[in-house]
């Protein structure tokens, strides 16, 4: 601990930005989720530390009284310790950790807090590791460049640590191979501790030995570290890991051999053989992936002891390639090498760490057409530090120009956010894409509000993207830190006063990707600070008050500059700065403000804030001391001279460029003499050829020149004005095959007219450029390592065997993938349209060919002809599509916890019993209904056979469990809902909590069937009349002609089906509408029936029946459809019951206004109608209907009783709840949550709301979702039967209905890429 304390005073209050190993593998370019997780952890740690400080620094004067002070302290303590997620032991550990950090020396406290320790043990480990590293003896190191040994004390003395840093980095630059055209400035670590720790982490080597092409990477040390890290990785994994120990590896080989030898195999043997196989390689048994016949590629399994050697050799063979290249090479040959193992190895590879620490992701500026086209909108939560009624900050940034706007908000309601955005849009214009890290729902609501306020505005919600220079989370946290810093400095809580200055500071930094600041990018000019940006002195500016005085001051300044310029001309002094000032025509020149007037200064290298004490001697830019290189030609007495790394790199590249130019052979003088004859316009090109050896320096110099911000940095541009636009000209030649290449396993083949190498082991044909020993050897060692040690005679024998065998086609010629995908895309609509399969070839294909031949030509028609669309092909495609949809459905159900079923059976055209089953489950923040499966029952439809069909599919095929089935809905048939052996009863034995529901629509139809004798006689008479006319074709034609002559609205009567009782409503309505036409027609045919239409009492009963049946038809239609819930159905039934009760009361007062047809008859006939008898008949019928509805829909079984909180949890009444006391308390808490209330009002469906509330209130949401998952009717099964009757007709009675039925009824989109990747395309037969 003392050694640690001795080092930390050197920090001088500066905390390093990075601790531990300074060189890490950068995976930001390949996997952004790592950065997001680390940013989230930093945000949580910062929030907890801030809460702790606020708790400790809380003052009694900040509150109006003692009760408020105590309440505020409790809230701050809760925010710090988080008792909701921490146990008592964890809270105690946090208190001990705080006290432990307090007793540490001040130098150690800041360093330890940077590591965000979670417990005291982590602090002890950090301090012990640091003490151990600082107490280790310094070893002697050898410098390969100078051939002499230098100790660590001699190489990095304490007095000149920073001075030696520049010299060592210069020597490192001389040895490094340039790998990127972009400059890589030194890291701003701000202390000698960083330099010391970096030296130790590199094992004591000199910094100049940082060579990315170094071959020695200490494999033995890497091996030991790799296996230790691998052991820790496997401890955190489950038993189902892909990495095998050697014992497990040998055991698997033994089990696979035993399984293959068994004559009668068990299920476990089949599963094992489906994954593994064993082959013999050079006398050793190897475990490989089972070959399924679709591919002949062999992929090996590795055990843990061979893992490091494979990774190490592959990494060296690809020249220290990154994770993507290693993954591509390894996974092509090995089955169980994962990304985690590859990344584990890469973190131990020193050259990769050194290389990636210098490489940066290239930042590219967006084109001008994307300005104000995409914006980032986020909300900064300031509820813990409100400024009056303002509790949030709107952070708006244009992702192209990086222009930032900040607005204070009172709430986070979408309406207020939209008004603040409109204020910004009226300044810079509205974007096309709006993205936000506050969630898709928030963005959608804001876009919707913007559209309501400004209808012409069209903005879409974009996918989340990070900014090029800094992520939105980091920017938000940076703004929050600036606000808290200002509040503490000024001892004020009114942060809205400083918000405008924060906005300006965000728009002032220089962005290297854009080569300018956000203000300059957006407005083509730097942000002005009045006359503070002028060339006038401060005293003169302070004395100016009018524009006339300003004009006079400008004239005097111009005269002064001109006099100085003329004086410099006479004396021969450099006057470039004065020339620039004289060439400025505006009255206020474009010049950077003095350092004394800048509110925020930034380093020109790292773009971070700096004090402005140090400046570059070349470009006069503000820099950190660590970001510069000490000048070697500084004069005595002038102090230490510093050059920024950008200028230093520019001068270094220029020096190397000049040295190489001087080393080139001298060309003849006539080639150097410029010609006086210009080229003709047709011979002038837009590029010129340069020597290949100079291209790097030309591009490097051009890249550095783009970062300059003054004319002094561009001093060399005049000599090479167009070098940045030059192109490298590669020599084009064909490599020849050498017979010695056979020892690498390659022979020569002719591909077209080019000679190419072909591997005799795997048959891969490489490019002609790969015909050289290094690349051929790389292929051999990376893909065929097991035979890499074989002698030359082995490969010659393999070559002879290959030539003696029939010619094998290794590389399959181009296959018509487009034709294969086209066949799938045609098969899908054929199945959706429920048409015969032959239509694809006989109609669709011929029509497409004719259209292509007419519009695109014969070549396009020939391509269409290649698409396979025969009858059998379409059948196979539909089967594959159905299987893929089924696999996706099963995966989605397994992801959801609960599901419910809807089942029914019917008889098809071939007298086969078809069982249809639908499923409802949670998916994508909503409840989804899908066709589950269909099954054919060849014999009886007993409950046992139905149950076995359901169980075999759900349990055996899908691997689901019935205990997660929360409900089963059927039509009430005996085989479904009998008292003893029904399907539902057997399912409830496996799932006791499963609820059974009888179809609401079916029960409503049953309730309508009870009718009085008088009304039933009217129905019978109507049926006879309809059958008399419709059964005789002559009567039907004569009646149609009569209706036409009488100009009736309808010309035909309608038939009804007895099984569909409510279909009589349309028959009765049609009969009532053309009653006069029927009276005329029946007078000559059936006079007895014509008397019925003359009887006003019979006609009144007909009118009533047509009215009441039409009303219940409407009710029946409203109960049909998808995504209906148990509660919506119960609401409609209860509403109809209350209507019947009200109608009954109105009838007693002779009010018939609710029956329109009956009211028409009463108004027509007047007193001829026996109104008393009619009142009795209707009242009796309405009473029977109420009794039937109460029988089929008992009030005591109303699902809403005790569950009304599910429909609206924010109701004031919380009585008669089917909840425990604990859940009732949670419901009361939910009802007062304003955020959820807003979400409830804006959510489209009730299930979506409860799914969103599941994170905060899981118990309540689970109860609600179980009831919302229940099917209220068998509507989906009925629509499925209709589809079944269309697909399987008497002409297609032998069709296997299951595959086309799934494709026609399912809403899941098939994965065509996956289907086509498993098949080999071929032309149509």
From Swiss-Prot:
Protein known as: SCAN domain-containing protein 3
Integrase catalytic domain mapped to chain residues: 366-526
GO CC annotation terms, alphabetical: cytoplasm; nucleus
Signal in keyword set: no
Keywords: Coiled coil, Nucleus
Residue ranges occupied by any SCAN box domain in the UniProt entry: 52-134
Gene assigned in the entry: SCAND3
Pfam (any one): SCAN
Coiled-coil region(s): 246-275, 542-568
GO BP: DNA integration; positive regulation of cell cycle; positive regulation of epithelial cell proliferation
Expression (tissue specificity): Weakly expressed in the lung (at protein level).
Compartment(s): Nucleus
Additional note from the record: Highly expressed in non-small-cell lung carcinoma (NSCLC) tissue, with increased expression correlating with advanced disease, lymph node metastases and poor prognosis, as such may be a candidate prognostic marker. May act as an oncogene and promote tumor growth via positive regulation of cell cycle progression at G1/S phase transition. May promote invasion and metastasis via activation of the AKT/GSK-3 beta signaling pathway. Expressed in the cytoplasm in NSCLC tissue.
Source organism: Homo sapiens
Listed GO MF terms: nucleic acid binding
Alphabetical list of InterPro entries matching this protein: Integrase_cat-core, RNaseH-like_sf, RNaseH_sf, SCAN_dom, SCAN_sf
Principal location listed in the UniProt entry: nucleus
């Amino acid at each position: 601990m003392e050694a640690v304390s001795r080092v930390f005073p050197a920090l001088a209050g500066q905390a390093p930005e990075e601790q531990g190993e300074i060189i890490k593998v950068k995976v930001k370019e390949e996997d952004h989720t790592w950065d997001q997780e680390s940013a989230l952890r930093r945000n949580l740690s910062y929030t907890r530390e801030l809460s702790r400080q606020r708790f400790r620094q809380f003052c009694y004067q900040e509150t109006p009284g003692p009760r408020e002070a105590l309440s505020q302290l409790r809230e701050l303590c809760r925010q710090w310790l988080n008792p909701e997620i921490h146990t008592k032991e964890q809270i105690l550990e946090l208190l001990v950790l705080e006290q432990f950090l307090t007793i540490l020396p001040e130098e150690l406290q800041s360093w330890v807090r940077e590591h965000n320790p979670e417990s005291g043990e982590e602090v002890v480990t950090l301090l012990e590791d640091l003490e151990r590293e600082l107490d280790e003896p310094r070893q002697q190191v050898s410098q390969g460049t100078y051939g002499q040994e230098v100790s660590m004390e001699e190489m990095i003395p304490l007095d000149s640590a920073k001075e030696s840093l520049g010299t060592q980095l210069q020597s490192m630059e001389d040895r490094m191979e340039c790998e990127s055209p972009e400059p890589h400035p030194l890291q701003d670590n701000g202390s000698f501790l960083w330099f010391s720790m970096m030296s130790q982490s590199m094992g004591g080597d000199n910094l100049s030995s940082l060579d990315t092409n170094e071959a020695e990477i200490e494999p033995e040390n890497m091996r030991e570290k790799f296996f230790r890290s691998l052991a820790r990785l496997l401890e955190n994994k489950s038993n189902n890991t892909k990495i095998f120990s050697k014992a497990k590896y040998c055991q698997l080989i033994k089990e696979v051999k035993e399984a293959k030898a068994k004559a009668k195999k068990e299920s476990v043997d089949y599963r094992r053989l489906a994954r593994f196989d064993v082959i013999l390689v050079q006398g050793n048994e190897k475990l490989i992936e089972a070959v399924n016949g679709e591919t002949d590629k062999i992929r090996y399994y590795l055990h843990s002891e061979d893992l490091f050697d494979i990774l190490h050799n592959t990494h060296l063979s690809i020249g220290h390639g990154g994770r993507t290249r290693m993954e591509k090479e390894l996974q092509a040959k090995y089955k169980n090498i994962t990304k985690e193992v590859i990344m584990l190895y890469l973190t131990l590879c020193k050259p990769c760490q050194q290389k990636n620490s210098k490489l940066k992701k290239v930042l590219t500026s967006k084109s001008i057409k994307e300005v104000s086209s995409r914006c980032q909108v986020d909300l900064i939560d300031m509820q813990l530090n409100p400024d009056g009624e303002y509790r949030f900050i709107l952070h708006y940034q244009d992702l192209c120009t990086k222009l930032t706007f900040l607005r204070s908000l009172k709430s986070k309601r979408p309406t207020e956010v939209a008004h603040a955005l409109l204020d910004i849009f009226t300044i810079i214009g509205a974007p096309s894409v709006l993205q936000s890290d506050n969630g898709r729902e928030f963005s959608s609501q804001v876009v919707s509000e913007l559209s309501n306020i400004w209808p012409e505005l069209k903005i879409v919600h974009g996918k989340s993207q990070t900014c090029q220079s800094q992520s939105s989370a980091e920017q938000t946290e940076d703004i929050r830190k600036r606000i808290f810093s200002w509040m503490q400095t000024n001892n004020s809580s009114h942060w809205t006063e400083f918000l405008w200055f924060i906005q300006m500071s965000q728009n002032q930094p220089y962005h290297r990707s854009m080569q300018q600041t956000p203000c300059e990018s957006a407005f083509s000019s730097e942000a002005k600070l009045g006359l503070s940006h002028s060339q006038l002195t401060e005293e003169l500016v302070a004395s100016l008050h009018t524009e006339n005085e300003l004009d006079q001051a400008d004239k005097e300044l111009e005269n002064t500059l001109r006099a100085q310029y003329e004086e410099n001309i006479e004396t021969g002094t450099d006057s470039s700065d004065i020339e620039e000032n004289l060439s400025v025509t505006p009255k206020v020149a474009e010049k950077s403000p003095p350092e004394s007037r800048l509110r925020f200064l930034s380093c020109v290298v790292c773009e971070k804030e700096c004090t402005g004490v140090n400046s570059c001697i070349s470009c006069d830019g503000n820099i950190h001391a660590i970001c510069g290189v000490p000048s070697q030609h500084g004069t005595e007495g002038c102090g230490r001279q510093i050059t920024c790394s950008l200028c230093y790199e520019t001068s270094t590249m220029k020096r190397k460029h000049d040295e190489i130019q001087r080393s080139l052979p001298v060309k003849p003088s006539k080639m150097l003499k410029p010609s006086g004859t210009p080229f003709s316009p047709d011979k002038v090109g837009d590029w010129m050829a340069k020597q290949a050896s100079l291209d790097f320096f030309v591009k490097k110099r051009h890249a550095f020149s783009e970062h300059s911000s003054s004319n002094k940095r561009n001093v060399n541009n005049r000599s090479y004005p167009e070098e940045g636009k030059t192109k490298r000209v590669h020599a084009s030649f064909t490599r020849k095959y050498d017979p010695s290449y056979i020892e690498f396993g390659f022979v020569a083949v002719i591909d077209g007219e080019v000679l190419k190498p072909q591997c005799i082991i795997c048959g891969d044909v490489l490019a002609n450029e790969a015909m050289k020993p290094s690349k051929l050897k790389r292929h051999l060692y990376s893909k065929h390592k097991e035979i890499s040690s074989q002698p030359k005679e082995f490969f010659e024998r393999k070559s002879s065997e290959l030539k003696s065998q029939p010619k094998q086609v290794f590389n399959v010629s181009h296959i018509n993938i487009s034709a294969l995908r086209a066949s799938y895309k045609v098969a899908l609509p054929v199945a959706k349209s429920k048409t015969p399969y032959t239509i694809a070839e006989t109609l669709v294909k011929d029509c497409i060919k004719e259209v292509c031949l007419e519009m695109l030509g014969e070549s396009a028609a020939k391509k269409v002809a290649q698409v396979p669309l025969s009858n059998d092909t379409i059948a196979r495609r539909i089967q594959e599509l159905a299987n893929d949809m089924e696999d996706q459905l099963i995966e989605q159900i397994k992801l959801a916890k609960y599901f419910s079923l809807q089942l029914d059976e019917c008889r098809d055209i071939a007298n086969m019993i078809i069982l249809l089953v639908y499923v409802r489950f949670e998916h994508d923040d909503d409840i989804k209904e899908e066709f589950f499966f269909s099954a054919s029952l060849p014999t009886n439809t007993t409950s046992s056979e139905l149950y076995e069909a359901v169980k075999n599919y759900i349990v055996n095929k899908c691997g689901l469990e019935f205990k997660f089935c929360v409900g089963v809905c059927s039509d009430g048939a005996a085989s479904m809902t009998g008292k003893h052996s029904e399907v539902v009863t057997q399912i409830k034995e496996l799932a006791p909590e499963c609820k059974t529901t009888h179809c609401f629509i079916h029960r409503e139809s049953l309730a309508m069937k009870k009718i009085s004798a008088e009304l039933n006689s009217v129905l019978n008479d109507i049926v006879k009349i309809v059958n008399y006319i419709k059964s005789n074709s002559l009567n039907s034609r004569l009646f149609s002609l009569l209706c036409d002559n009488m100009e009736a609205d309808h010309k035909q009567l309608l038939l009804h089906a007895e099984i569909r009782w409510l279909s009589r409503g349309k028959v009765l309505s049609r009969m009532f509408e053309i009653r006069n036409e029927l009276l005329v027609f029946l007078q000559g045919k059936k006079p007895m029936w014509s008397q019925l239409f003359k009887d006003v009492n019979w006609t009144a009963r007909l009118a009533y029946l047509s009215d009441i049946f039409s009303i219940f038809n409407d009710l029946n239609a409203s109960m049909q459809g998808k995504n209906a819930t148990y509660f919506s159905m119960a609401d409609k039934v209860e509403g109809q019951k209350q209507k019947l009760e009200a109608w009954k009361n109105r009838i007693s007062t002779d009010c018939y206004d609710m029956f329109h047809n009956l009211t028409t008859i009463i108004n027509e006939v007047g007193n001829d109608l026996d109104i008393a008898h009619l009142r009795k008949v209707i009242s009796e019928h309405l009473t029977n209907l109420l009794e039937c509805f109460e029988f089929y829909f008992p009030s005591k079984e109303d699902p809403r009783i005790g569950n009304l909180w599910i429909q609206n949890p924010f109701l004031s009444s919380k009585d008669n709840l089917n909840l425990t006391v604990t859940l009732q308390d949670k419901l009361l808490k939910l009802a007062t949550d304003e955020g959820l209330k807003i979400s409830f009002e804006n959510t489209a469906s009730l299930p979506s709301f409860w799914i969103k509330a599941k994170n905060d209130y899981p118990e309540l949401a689970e109860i609600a979702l179980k009831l919302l998952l229940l099917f209220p009717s068998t509507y989906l099964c009925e629509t499925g039967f209709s589809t079944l009757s269309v697909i399987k007709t008497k002409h297609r009675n032998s069709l296997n209905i299951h595959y086309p039925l799934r494709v026609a009824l399912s809403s899941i989109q098939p994965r065509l890429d996956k289907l086509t990747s498993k098949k080999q395309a071929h032309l149509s037969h």
